[in-house]
Amino acid sequence: MPLVNPRKNLISICITDRKSDGTIYEKHIDVIRTMEKNNWKIKTHKIWVKGLGINMFRLNYMHIMTFMKKLSKVNLTKEFKPDIFVDDKSTKYENYGYGMSLDVCELLIKEHTAIGDIVYDPFMGSGTTAIASIKNCRNYFGSEIDEKVKKLAENRLSSY
């Protein structure tokens, strides 16, 4: 789930490392290097623990990294923000294997955007970022190239 706020020059990226042939490929390191090479500075790096299920082919955590063009000391809220989220509420929707936690998505939106801001998700998937945006009075738009998944997102969004 990338979360883009163009007015604040802010991008949040949620990415998992991958297991391959019994080893872990740490994709988040490549993301950090690429962003820094393009003059983006990392503001926060958090971990989302997706529950305690064990699967030898998938990892049960994701990296949530927020990058800014210019680092800012101003927080939109004064709440303490934990660096580790433990939330196993991710959901599978109609054979769509990846379900982002709505709770984690809402936390990120509240932390990095203000009411009325625009949230863009270039990999919209099942529409969780859009739903979290609507629930928190943000404007949103998203992109999804898979027509089946796009229809799933449209169906979910129709009840909001």
Residue ranges of predicted features:
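Short, conserved SAM-binding/catalytic segment
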Residues: 154-160
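Core catalytic lobe of class I
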Residues: 1-143, 148-151
